[in-house]
Amino acid sequence: MSNFFAGLADVLTSEPAYIGAAAVAALLAFGACGEWIAERSGAINISVEAMMLAGAFGATMGYHLTERFTVGAVFGVGAGMLVGVCQAELSHRLTADQFVVGLSLNILILGLAGYLEDVIKPDTKRAATVDIPLLSDIPLIGEALFGQAWLFYLIYPLVPLCWWLVYRTGWGLEIRAVGGSPQSADVSGIDVNRRRRQSIYAVGATSGLGGAYLSLALVGSFEDDIVGGRGFIAMAAVVFGGWTLRGSIAGCVLFGTVLSFRLSLPVLGYEINNELLTALPAAAPIIGMAVFAHRVRAPAALAQPFIRGLR
């Protein structure tokens, strides 16, 4: 245990640890931004994992075909949205169970992406980092926040864009209305299921972009287990943050730091029990939600399907 805390002290003063924490936090934030919008609409989408995996594979294929990272990113967003369309149409048009659909998509995309990767064997490489002058020279955190691959920087405009959409547009007002009282929203003329479908399309887009960031910027290749449960951790960040965007991003930073901490300790030469390190990323969301769950309120209609005429 003394090794653990000594390692923690070293990690907190290690610039590479901050770089890793920021990179993983950004990955989680890509998924959490869209998931936050969906859950504010009352939709529960557990296929974030599948969307990220599809985005990672789509981005790899896009780069494989064109050797352009921008095209890869577009392919990633498209692949993530395709999974989002499946989730949205099955759950909020055909009224299939949201949890069953999400779980099925996670399993389907995992198998499909693995099969296609074995058959096609797409070739890619890791995008170069782009240092922002002066800002990247800030001690300890400069490289972490301003010395990453260009895909990383997309999270900076994405977060305020999502906030603006939900709180400063008529569409966002309707999203919040259908998440709070879908019956009242329906009476006022809002198409509840249409708004929920649109919110899930948004999750597909942001999670697909996150998958592209993972395969093109963080890893530089594709494997069928590349996401490794981070889609579920992004969902946990939304709950941890009390269904607020600010809280969700804070959760992403916390969980991303824990995930990075697991990888940083061995690199710094500390021999920590491998099972303990493996459990850390899963334990952090559970502990966080247990501590803060009583302080937050979920959208009133979260996970409740809407069928016109039924209460």
Stretches with model-predicted labels:
Residues 162, 180, 186-194, 265-311:
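Cytosolic-side transmembrane-helix boundaries in multi-pass membrane proteins
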Residues 16-69, 73, 78, 82-99, ...:
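Single transmembrane alpha-helix segments in multi-pass membrane proteins
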Residues 144-222, 245-250:
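Helix-loop-helix "hairpin" substructures at the membrane interface of multi-pass membrane proteins
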